[in-house]
Amino acid sequence: MPNWGGGKKCGVCQKTVYFAEEVQCEGNSFHKSCFLCMVCKKNLDSTTVAVHGEEIYCKSCYGKKYGPKGYGYGQGAGTLSMDKGESLGIKHEEAPGHRPTTNPNASKFAQKIGGSERCPRCSQAVYAAEKVIGAGKSWHKSCFRCAKCGKGLESTTLADKDGEIYCKGCYAKNFGPKGFGFGQGAGALVHSE
């Protein structure tokens, strides 16, 4: 059939689209009334349209049909849909059933993740409100002291050896270099035999 009016053809109904009712998208023309999602039939505009070949979709239906698969995809932030997409021709695969863990140290893992960690000094549970981390372990604030002199420590002012924590002074005296001038402070010269 000849195109006497010279207008463009609608990408949906293939009828002539006149200027007053034309919506353009990716080089194609549509009637305003035909510019609808091919699945849910919602009205579209330049901010809500998603194009796949010659087909137009709202972003939600496009995401369900062509985006990542799984619960929560294609809806937008903060939503979870149980729609598996059968209406879009998506085949659903059943997930394998739950199998119990084969980890022999499952109780240690559960203790770290599900329960509370234990303080290395007193072996009691350490909860978030009283936790201080030092030497890679969680301590009670009251237990976070030098093992020799009992001085309170900061995570930046400690030294650790064999699972215990020390202030820098006690660590230097007990585990540092031995000999003239070591471990006594500035200006001291001590002979040790």
UniProtKB/Swiss-Prot annotation:
Q: Provide this UniProt record's keywords sorted from A to Z.
A: Acetylation, Isopeptide bond, LIM domain, Metal-binding, Nucleus, Phosphoprotein, Repeat, Ubl conjugation, Zinc
Q: What is this protein called?
A: Cysteine and glycine-rich protein 1
Its GO biological process annotations read:
muscle tissue development; nervous system development; sarcomere organization
One GO CC term, this protein: nucleus
Quote the SUPFAM superfamilies the UniProt record gives: Glucocorticoid receptor-like (DNA-binding domain)
The location annotated for the cross-link Glycyl lysine isopeptide (Lys-Gly) (interchain with G-Cter in SUMO2) is 91
Specify the domain of life of the species encoding this protein.
Answer: Eukaryota
Quaternary structure and interacting proteins, as annotated = Interacts with ASCC1; ASCC2 and TRIP4.
UniProt xrefs under CDD domains: LIM1_CRP1 (cd09479), LIM2_CRP (cd09403)
Primary role: Could play a role in neuronal development.
Q: Which residues carry this modification: N6-acetyllysine?
A: 84, 112, 131, 137, 161
Start and end residues of each LIM zinc-binding domain: 10-61, 119-170
* Subcellular location(s) per record: Nucleus
Q: Where is this motif: Nuclear localization signal?
A: 64-69
Is-annotated flag, keyword Phosphoprotein?
Answer: yes
**Which of the residues bear the PTM Phosphoserine?**
81, 192
One GO term in the molecular function aspect is: metal ion binding
